[in-house]
Amino acid sequence: MLIFPLINDTSRKIIHIDMDAFFAAVEERDNPALKGKPVVIGKDPRETGGRGVVSTCNYEARKYGIHSAMSSKEAYERCPKAIFISGNYEKYRTVGDQIRRIFKRYTDLVEPMSIDEAYLDVTDNKLGIKSAVKIAKLIQHDIWKEVGLTCSAGVSYNKFLAKLASDFEKPHGLTLVLKEDALCFLAKLPIEKFHGVGKKSVEKLHDMGIYTGQDLLAVPEMTLIDHFGRFGFDLYRKARGISNSPVKSDRIRKSIGSERTYAKLLYQETDIKAEISKNAKRVAALLQDHKKLGKTIVLKVRYADFTTLTKRVTLPELTRNAAQIEQVAGDIFDSLSENPAGIRLLGVTMTNLEDKVADISLDL
């Protein structure tokens, strides 16, 4: 017996665009001498005493098992000839904006998921093109011609399948999943490839003998709900290619933050407070850009031994004032117990966001 109704809208035309090794690809585009060489976006461990982490890397570097969040030291050990580049995030953001403008030629229903990927609903697109595959090919062509980068595209009738499809053939691939092919497509996939299924859920599913989409399809709904609660129903739907989540052109931001990992550990309070100030000003600028105000300020501190502390303070009124954010974040730091270990990461985040309203004085 079904606990929740199964409604499968297969009438939509959804595209998921995922840029190929985006940061590294931008660097290769701007420096052709890098092409064909393993490129890692991250601090060179030879210059930082082995500290730092990999932000991303190109496909050549991935052949050596290098991946994002790996320590730069391990990346170097795996591939001593890798070229490490610190990265220019303002440049990447500018390129990302250029790509989003290309998306907007075809539809206003664009939901950016990050700087290098987005969902597009092209069911009723601006050019009246009936084929979503044709639109995906045009977007790939436009991005290559105007930006000099490649992307992979997934096309299907919902976001879940489109996302899986874009991962299926990279780089510069295009995969279509029709409604009549969805079950076959999902059946062959390892369960860890299912978007939205995290590491702990994968471990639990493996313990239940579920390794593929085909295995998941065979499990009764109530069994999944008993083991996973409401998420069990989501798994039941995913196995059947059902997801009616809309493409939201204006995603509701739940938080705005800025954090930085330091190649050289921070010990001195003056240095720590200076970095808190930089993060606070960055958050204030982002709040201004997104026309948001916030009430809860969160400070994140990660020490040399990777112990991570987060502490928050909720203000009585909304703000986006840099000095106020800096003051509160600094006060939070002062309230933490002293730790002789150096600090490797500091972050400041504003949550409890609301849209800007006219009757609030923002800079007082």
From Swiss-Prot:
The keyword Magnesium applies. It catalyses: DNA(n) + a 2'-deoxyribonucleoside 5'-triphosphate = DNA(n+1) + diphosphate. Keywords: Cytoplasm, DNA damage, DNA repair, DNA replication, DNA-binding, DNA-directed DNA polymerase, Magnesium, Metal-binding, Mutator protein, Nucleotidyltransferase, Transferase. Residues 14-198 form the UmuC domain. GO terms for biological process: DNA-templated DNA replication; error-prone translesion synthesis; SOS response. GO terms for cellular component: cytosol. Binds 2 magnesium ions per subunit. It is an enzyme of class 2 (transferase). It is found in: Cytoplasm. Its cofactor is Mg(2+). Pfam families: IMS (PF00817), IMS_C (PF11799), IMS_HHH (PF11798). Poorly processive, error-prone DNA polymerase involved in untargeted mutagenesis. Copies undamaged DNA at stalled replication forks, which arise in vivo from mismatched or misaligned primer ends. These misaligned primers can be extended by PolIV. Exhibits no 3'-5' exonuclease (proofreading) activity. May be involved in translesional synthesis, in conjunction with the beta clamp from PolIII. Belongs to the DNA polymerase type-Y family. PANTHER family: DNA POLYMERASE KAPPA, DNA REPAIR POLYMERASE UMUC / TRANSFERASE FAMILY MEMBER. This is DNA polymerase IV. It comes from Streptococcus pyogenes serotype M18 (strain MGAS8232).
